[in-house]
A protein has these predicted regions:
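Non-transmembrane, aqueous-exposed alpha-helical and coiled segments at domain scale
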Residues: 1-308
Length: 309
């Protein structure tokens, strides 16, 4: 890889051992993907977790003196003061979360504790190069905002935040952002939740960048988040297009880069029913409780739940 002087200085340890470690791993990632250079980022999001390995790395980097050049937002943890007061977590859980919080503060992260920052607090501009981890984030920033991010892991996004660079490959390159699968949606898509089920059809859609035709004209931001999150978890999709809706697909021809789709897939009501059946309890058993993930909720679904209760 061809490195600039600043990048080489990072690799040589002139900015400290923490930044050196981060750059060393990033160069290795770039070489494994055939990247020719590193490019600067302006935004980042780290899928922070409180698990041992992730916390160990954050503490190690902080201990080596690493500081984030690009201040990242982070995924959810729990509110230390509130949960301690309520007494709903064990002392061990509290202490581990406190360590995670302390490590990311030392690194200079923005402790937003929100896994959907791309919808409000960390919104990239069209064409902006970013490093976003979190399964729902990468499809959203690429597809809906037209920004550019590869599917970063929590650790690689943290390394990018520290160095301020990412290797240039994959979805950072124009030629890799065109669709190659036409998905004809003949199923009835009636509400935001249906986009969850549509996204879980990844096994039938197959690997690539899908271009969806036949969707309703008015799609909420929550529905788009649902679609991208399930596409990424069901089939590792980093991007999709909706002609006439997403910024890089003003029409279907542009969505495919002027080429014909490699394959055409049709999604019917039967496909949605099959997916729904696969994630349901056998025999349609009653559920014991429902957990509403507030970090994924925006104002609209919160209001719906409020009025339903």
């Amino acid at each position: 890889m061809k490195l600039t002087q600043d990048q080489q200085d990072l690799l040589d340890g002139k900015f400290g051992e923490g930044a050196k470690l981060a750059m060393k791993v990033q160069v290795a990632i770039g070489e494994s993907f055939g990247a020719e250079r590193m490019v600067p980022i302006t935004r980042a999001h780290v899928a922070l977790s409180n698990q041992d390995a992730d916390r160990w790395l954050a503490e190690k980097l902080a201990g080596l003196g690493a500081k984030c050049r690009v201040r990242p937002t982070v995924n959810p943890g729990f509110c230390l003061s509130y949960f301690k007061k309520m007494g709903v977590v064990t002392n061990k859980d509290y202490e581990e979360m406190e360590r995670t919080d302390r490590a990311y503060r030392a690194l200079g992260a923005e402790l937003s504790y929100n896994c959907t920052p791309y919808m409000d607090t960390n919104v990239p501009l069209f064409g902006e190069i970013c490093a976003f981890s979190e399964s729902s984030a990468t499809p959203y920033v690429n597809s809906i905002w037209g920004a550019r991010s590869n599917r970063e892991g929590a650790n690689s996004a943290l390394f990018a935040s520290i160095t301020g660079y990412v290797p240039e490959y994959g979805l950072l390159l124009d030629e890799n952002r065109h669709g190659n699968i036409l998905v004809q949606v003949e199923a009835d898509i009636k509400c935001d939740a249906d986009y969850h089920i549509l996204g879980m059809c990844g096994k039938k859609i197959g690997h690539g960048i899908p271009v969806f035709a036949g969707l309703p004209k008015n799609i909420t931001k929550e529905a788009l988040r649902n679609l991208g999150a399930e596409l990424n978890t069901s089939g590792s999709y980093d991007m999709y297009h909706i002609p006439g809706f997403t910024p890089e697909a003003p029409d279907i021809k542009t969505a495919f880069g002027g080429k014909e789709p490699e394959r055409v897939v049709t999604i019917t009501n039967d496909d949605l029913a099959e997916v729904l059946e696969s994630i349901s309890l056998p025999g349609h058993q009653p559920i014991d409780f429902a957990m509403l993930k507030c970090t994924l909720f925006t104002g609209h679904p919160v209001r719906r739940v409020h009025f339903a209760l």
